[in-house]
Amino acid sequence: MASNNVAQFAAELKMPAGVLLEQLQAAGVTKASEDDSLSETDKARLLDHLRKSHGSTDADKRKITLTKRHTSEIKQSDATGKARTIQVEVRKKRTFVRRDETSAENGDASNHVAEADVDDLELQRREEEARHEAELLEKQAQELKARQEQLEREEAERQAREAAAEAERRRAEEEAAKKRAAAEAAAREQAQAAKPAQAAQPAAAKAEPVAAKAAEPAVAKQSEQDDERAAAERAAQREAAKKAEDAARQAAEKARAEQEQIAKRRAAAEAEARAIREMMNTPRKAQVKAPEPAPKPAEPAKAAEAKGTLHKPARPAGEAPSRPAAKKPAAAAPAATTTPSAGDKKKPGGGKGGWQDDAAKRRGIKTRGDTSGGVDRGWRGGPKGRGKHQDQNTTFQAPTEPIVREVHVPETITVADLAHKMAVKASEVIKSMMKLGQMVTINQMLDQETAMIIVEELGHHAVAAKLDDPEAMLVEGEISDAESLPRPPVVTVMGHVDHGKTSLLDYIRRAKVAAGEAGGITQHIGAYHVETPRGVITFLDTPGHEAFTAMRARGAKATDIVILVVAADDGVMPQTKEAIAHAKAGGVPLVVAINKIDKPDANPDRVKQELVAEGVVPEEYGGDSPFVSVSAKTGAGIDDLLENVLLQAEVLELKAPVEAPAKGLVIEAKLDKGKGPVATILVQSGTLNRGDVVLAGSAYGRVRAMLDETGKPTKSAGPSIPVEIQGLSEVPQAGEEVIVMPDDRKAREVALFRQGKFRDVKLAKQQAAKLENMLEQMGEGEVAYMPLIVKADVQGSQEALVQSLLKLSTDEVRVQIVHGAVGGISESDVNLATASKAVIIGFNTRADAQARKLAEANGVDIRYYNIIYDAVDEVKAAMSGMLAPEKREIVTGTVEVRQVFKVPKIGAVAGCMVTDGFVKRSSSVRVLRNNVVIFTGELDSLKRFKDDVKEVRQGFECGMSIKNFNDIVEGDQFEVFEITEVARTL
């Protein structure tokens, strides 16, 4: 609580009130009694008075002195060339004074004086450093100049030696040429001398035969001597030429070696000069440069000159792995021992070295910038201290060439496998991963990119491994030691829709399959194996509707024999021709079954003629295709058909390995709500067991359950046996090859590769709106789109329905399949339909309760179909409603102009007679002059007498004016017409 009067303030200060009153009076504060009040101003005046009376000032409290120390290092070489590191400590003292209005000027003056003292010391130190640095730079410049002069002298000497060698070579060549010319001249003289002797010989022989016989030995002897002399001269010439060439080659090699040595010296001098220039351009504080390799021991004088400069500290012996001394250990060792270091002094331990040396050095000054401390002395070592614990920096070790391996990195690899490929410990790989910020274990999987980065970090060469090719795996599977055994034939039943394929198969299987198909037509591939008295046959029943072309092609691809079913009362139809084409393309033999022979209007002969026209010739006509007349209703001819099928199978000699990994074909695939992805597989070779890891396209997984065509569980399936498997990661595409893989990792690797490879194809099938499509739409004008989402029960039906709907697209209306998949209609499908304004088509599927509720809330249209005809027809009708209506002109009447009136503010008005039909007020009109159309427009007014009328019929007169047209002449004709819109259909 603040004191308000003199008595309270005296009690607070613990002094008598009378003494306080006296002090207040002395300070100029007039207070009469102890009860008088005191203000803050009175207290401040009292405080100032007491300070002045006691002689105390606040000058010391207003001044702060700061002392700053800065330690730096410089390197200096003495006269012997030893490099020394000198520590420089700069102490700066600065005083800050708190100024007020009265003493501002005095404070400034004192501050300047204090700073001036410090600045003088700093200035002197900087001048000394600058002078020292200038001396060093001048010394280095002189050294550089001397070295350049020496190089120039060496270059001049080399050129002189080359000129002398060249002159010697030319002189030798000239001498050899002179000798060669002299020898040739002597040979010519001998030849000329021999010619007269030969010419005179016949005459002498005729006159004196005895003398000629006596002279023959002398001539022969002379010619032999001449030949020997010429051979000796040629040998001497060759020897002289060879000596001249050897001398020239030796001179050239010597000159080249000298030139290379001079070039090396020049390059070293230029590098040193460039380094000096760079350091001269660097800031003054950046004095510690990355150490450079020490000079060769063969040049001690130059090494001494190169050491001990401000900008070039010498490098320790063990730091430069690429220095020349590393190649010659015997020469490097003396250099290391004979060059004393800058700080070498006798240690207390003498020559014992070891830990005492290290402790002594630690107690010394640790210079941060001195990376060398001498030529061959590191931080820990010294020439005297080579004991039991000598430092590695002072011990020469022969460099070992690191082994760089080429590591093939697959898509995924564990840490242990990667370390094994590089021949390093797994801990090294884990350390590298930790440096990159990832904590991994020894069994953790790494992706290819991360693994390649690790390989490069550890100094090896990483190569992306060639991805596993499923075709290569198939080839490897074929090269198997398993014995090939006979297998059942795979028979595909093909033909036109409603020709009785399924009924025929139904009779063979003794099961009512056709009754279960919607509309009585097959919309899936059915795979069954039937045990007959003659053997096992696997049947594939394919759809005959035109929409299922791809499904039929898959059936022909997997089959051995095709049964072509043709109705005897219908003949060859479009899908019959297509089935024949599929069978021929696959090189599959045909067995023709002429069905429905029990009908009254059956005509098998006509069917045979039509098939012959298609290239299918019966055996009775000299062909190779057996024709069997059957009736699926009565069972007539069924046994003959099976017998022909098995006969064809025996001819083909169908075999497959049984004790081998299975491979096959996906016949059909679907998404079951309780089972997940389900695929119908036809095993083509090997044996498929429950628990095997299978790969089907981009789907993979372990076979969790396996059912036969009757729905009964089975543990294994051999060749030509169809089974339904569960456990795949996703619904595979129908027609994909199925391969049994050795393990999950390999299967996942190939599946991920295929997913990445075919991602673009998948996106293209979804037909997302992209820039190209937008540009197409802009070029084509207004194009209407019908977005659809197609969900089907199986993959083949969904594929066939999508293809059929896409065929409905025209230039004006296009079908856009936003999404197509297998399975029930879910909430995500409804949300997608809401965003894309699409219609959902469910083919043999239904929406769950949540999806139906969401569709009702968002107004999404869901259509259900179980026959492909109905889906295609309704979409076609909806697309017809989206077409722009067609405009048609209907001529309603003809008018003849009898008279033309000019009306102010209106223009020309034609007095007309309706000669045919009628004229309406809202009609359009064409003006004909001499039967040529000169104008087309609309009526502006239609009057009869003075009244506006809506219609004037034939035989009546009227007045007409045309909008924006006044060039009306008597005798013109008006053709009156109306434009109507007519709905279009696809």
Curated annotation (Swiss-Prot):
InterPro entries membership: DNA-bd_dom_put_sf, EF-G-like_DII, IF2_assoc_dom_bac, IF2_II, IF2_N, P-loop_NTPase, Small_GTP-bd, T_Tr_GTP-bd_dom
Biased composition (Basic and acidic residues): 122-182, 228-277
GO cellular component: cytosol
G1, as annotated region: 495-502
Region G4, annotated ranges: 595-598
Bias type Gly residues, positions: 371-384
Stretches for region G5: 631-633
A single MF term (Gene Ontology): GTPase activity
Chain residue ranges for the region called Disordered: 95-394
Localization in the cell: Cytoplasm
Record function comment: One of the essential components for the initiation of protein synthesis. Protects formylmethionyl-tRNA from spontaneous hydrolysis and promotes its binding to the 30S ribosomal subunits. Also involved in the hydrolysis of GTP during the formation of the 70S ribosomal complex.
UniProt family annotation: Belongs to the TRAFAC class translation factor GTPase superfamily. Classic translation factor GTPase family. IF-2 subfamily.
UniProt xrefs under PANTHER family: TR-TYPE G DOMAIN-CONTAINING PROTEIN, TRANSLATION INITIATION FACTOR IF-2-RELATED
Protein name in the entry: Translation initiation factor IF-2
Native source organism of the sequence: Paraburkholderia phytofirmans (strain DSM 17436 / LMG 22146 / PsJN) (Burkholderia phytofirmans)
